Amino acid sequence: MLIWENNEDIRLIICANNRREIQKALNDCREERRPYVFVTPTMREILQINRILVPVTMLEEETYKAEICTYLARKTGAHLILLKAHDYGSHAQQNINRIKTHIESVSAKTGIPISYEIREAQKDSFSLYKEAVERQNDTAHQLLVLTASREYGLDDLLFGPPERQAIQRSQVPVMLVNPRADLFSLCD
């Protein structure tokens, strides 16, 4: 496993595509305040980021991704695809609305248009990360941005956390954001 920490803003983790190595890296990054990106040998080589897929579930911490995704879209000119979980409650929609408001406010403040679209997923919040990985050819994105698990429950210990499963199956780099209110801010 290689961890590149020369960048103050983002931590890059290059590791083998096996569950032990990925889980070790996930455990090492549990307290990380900045986003971290996983790259494995089975992922496609990415030369430019044009589209970023951002799955949004019912969990409140999903909104923490807004700042980072907006920053990346603004700096790379990438198009954001917000994939909303197909839930019966209104929490996923509220999170989408918060992220949308943040994107539009940053765009208005900076004068830089940020392109985004909202797509409805077929799966609920609990299966959304799996669907995001399955839709890689459909969305043609070059980066997948996920929220890391806040706590590991029994199912995470038995089957692995959803972010580890997404990293193992993904064909593109996966950026993780820890669910913390005091996240490292990306500044210009």
Language model features with spans:
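Short beta->alpha junction loops
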Residues: 1, 116-125
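Intrinsically disordered or low-complexity boundary/linker segments at protein termini
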Residues: 2-67, 75, 83, 169-188
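Short beta-strand-loop elements within alpha/beta enzyme cores
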Residues: 2-30, 129-169
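Short acidic/polar alpha-helix capping motifs at helix-coil junctions
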Residues: 32-35, 94-99, 126-130
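Small/aliphatic-rich secondary-structure junction motif
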Residues: 51-118, 137-142, 169-170, 174, ...
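Glycine- and other small-residue-rich loops at beta-strand/loop junctions that grip anionic moieties
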Residues: 58, 121, 155
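Short, well-ordered secondary-structure micro-motifs
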Residues: 65, 92-95, 127, 156-157, ...
